[in-house]
Amino acid sequence: MKKYLNLTALLLVGISNVTWANAVNELQNRLNKIDVLSADYTQQVTDAQGKKIQQGSGKIQLKRPNLFRMDNETPQESQIIADGKTLWFYDPFVEQVTANWVEDTLSDTPFVLLTSNNPSHWQQYIVEQKSDTFIIKPKSKKSTIKQFNIRIEKDGVLKNFSTIEKDGQSNLYILRKITNPALNDAIFTFTLPKGVEFDDQRKK
C-alpha cells in the first residue's frame, strides 16, 4: 500500500512540474511578442477587505530584454527603472534614491519578469495559468509579495498586472493607450539627481 502511495505522490509531483513548465512557456511566448511597449496606466490600491484606499496614474515603458521603467505621476511622483543590472527607485517627495542589483530584488519585484527570459529568474516563482491570467507566486518565504498576476492575451496584448502583498493589500495596474514605438535605451538609464540621499544597497 505504501508503495502505491509513494508512486501516486511521485506522479502528482510530475504532473505539477509539467503544469508549471507549460504555464511558464505559455507566458514567456506571449511576453516575447512584446519587443517594446509604452502605455499609460491607472492604479487601484485596495486593502485586504477589498476596499479601495487609493487611486493613481502614470506611464510604463518596456523593452526586451531586461529594460523596464515606471513613472508614477499621481497621487505622488515616483520612478522605478531597471537598466538590466540595477533596479533604481526614486522618491522625489523624500528626495531619496535606492539602488539594488536586479538579481537581489526578484522575489519582491516581479515586474522584472515582464522583460526577462532568464531561466534563473523564472525558477524563483511558481506559475499557474487561468485563461489569459497568469498567477505568479514567489518561492521565497521572505518575499513581501504574496503573488503577482499578469493578464496578457494570446497575441501579446498586455491588459493589466497586479501585486498582492502578504498583508492582503492589492495594487492593480490597468494599461491604456498602448503603443509599440522605438524606444532608445537611454530612456532606461537613471541619472542621480543632485542633492538627494542615495542608498546604494549594491555595496552591502
From Swiss-Prot:
The keyword DNA damage does not apply. Its main location: periplasm. One of its GO terms (biological process) is lipoprotein transport. Keywords: Chaperone, Periplasm, Protein transport, Signal, Transport. Transmembrane segments: none annotated. It is found in: Periplasm. CDD domains: LolA. Residues 1-21 form the signal peptide. GO terms for cellular component: outer membrane-bounded periplasmic space. The keyword NAD does not apply. Belongs to the LolA family. PANTHER family: OUTER-MEMBRANE LIPOPROTEIN CARRIER PROTEIN (PTHR35869:SF1). Participates in the translocation of lipoproteins from the inner membrane to the outer membrane. Only forms a complex with a lipoprotein if the residue after the N-terminal Cys is not an aspartate (The Asp acts as a targeting signal to indicate that the lipoprotein should stay in the inner membrane). Monomer. NCBIfam families: lolA. This is Outer-membrane lipoprotein carrier protein. The lineage of its organism: Bacteria, Pseudomonadati, Pseudomonadota, Gammaproteobacteria, Pasteurellales.
